[in-house]
Amino acid sequence: SKKVDVHVFALASPYRVIVDAPDVDFQMPEGIGKEKRGLITAYRYGLFAPGKSRIVIDVGGPFLIDKAFVLEPRDDQPARLVVDLVPTDEKTFQAKLKEAKPAEEASAAPPPLPEPVVRAPDAKPVIVLDPGHGGIDPGTSSADGVTEKDVVLAFAKSLKAKLEATGRYEVYLTREDDTFLPLRERVEFAQKKGAGLFLSIHADYFPEQTEKATGATVYTLSEQASDEEAKELATKENFSDAIAGVALPSDSDEVVANILIDLAQRETQNRSTVFARSIVGELAGNLHTHKMRSAGFRVLKAPDIPSVLIEIGFLSNPDDEKHLVSDAWRERISVSLVDAIDGYFAKRIARAPF
């Protein structure tokens, strides 16, 4: 309806154009953005952070941003965003990309790990619930248009209320509304809160087995995936940052992460497995055939926090979809997860940071 200030830039691996703007009201037809045209293979849009909207345009190869500007409303035409792209070679693309980055950004070291949180011995255990996706990243969606980001947020809020009602836990959500949070920031949020448990909540989609794929699946971290399906799911979930237009970690970041896992995460992984088994025990009858799996999920890589990812159901299955949008079902499964969390802490196997 009016001209806004925008910031347009390129990202690599994969090739993307990012358009950042103030919080705007996107009024687009349902399902738009999936059609290919010229250099563009797809695009998406949404709230990226409070007060900030983002458009992410997927590009099929190396490119240059020739022009980018916003036209004022004129002659009954609304304000229009214009971005001209031209194809180029990989060398030129990389040179322009490097040229566009501020020197301090290019040379910046990875951010340090948050300082450990010191808590009183009698403090309540801290639990961080992580509703996956959000904002510009909807996650998967059902044939009816029910999105993963919405069902997992509703479920996380239900579980938070149940946990807080016990009076035994201090509970936080990584996001409380329809905003996007990069994977690294989700982990850092849990570390800053001094979490004793981290539970990432998602919903799955498996169109090849619409009727057969049903129920919850519990995942723990493993550098070697338990099976091909777990590996594919981890790849998809780890791609969340790219979908939202976030630069992916460099190889050096991965080396640091792997060192941290080797040094600090062995015992944490054991605790995560104990927690996962507790969930499986309480969700009996509501589980997928392969109820417990493992793979290299970035969001589970906190070296000091027992972390589990749960896919609460399949949006590709009509029966599961009905459950996922049902208040009664959410309440019932939330009660089971509270029992699983109670059981984990009652065993007191690990000295998790409370």
Located regions from the model:
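Signal-peptide-cleaved, periplasmic/extracellular N-terminal interaction regions immediately downstream
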Residues: 1-126
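Short, solvent-exposed loop/turn elements at domain surfaces
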Residues: 7-9, 28-29, 92, 136-140, ...
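Soluble periplasmic/extracytoplasmic beta-strand elements of cell-envelope proteins
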Residues: 7-9, 16-22, 42-46, 54-58, ...
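Short connector loops/turns at beta-strand edges and beta->alpha or beta->beta junctions
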Residues: 24-26, 132-136, 168, 313-317
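Glycine-rich, flexible loop/turn motifs
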Residues: 36-41, 137, 179, 214-215, ...
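Catalytic-core regions of hydrolytic enzymes
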Residues: 102-256, 265-278, 331, 335, ...
